[in-house]
Amino acid sequence: MCGIIAISGVELDTIDQKRHLQSLHPRGPDAQDSFSYDNNVYMGFTRLSINDLSSDGMQPMQNDDKTVSMICNGEIYNYKEIAKKHNFNMKSKSDCEV
């Protein structure tokens, strides 16, 4: 199971984000990534690769214009069907992208 951290409502300068993300390493030993927005929203993710082992499946994921960001730890078994139904052009093989 992957690790997820989200921090909001505080000035990020006052928080050791890297330390918090590192504490989740046992939950997702394959990779980690994070991003922050406007110095008051932070999202971090430690990855346990299952479906898409490439970097394309890494999270947090963002849409093309970076107005929407998401992290998901789950299994969407019919993700190919959902993507086809909604004509969604997937960039990865990750079920969470839909």
Model-derived features with residue positions:
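N-terminus-centric sequence/structural signature that marks the extreme N-terminus
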Residues: 1-98
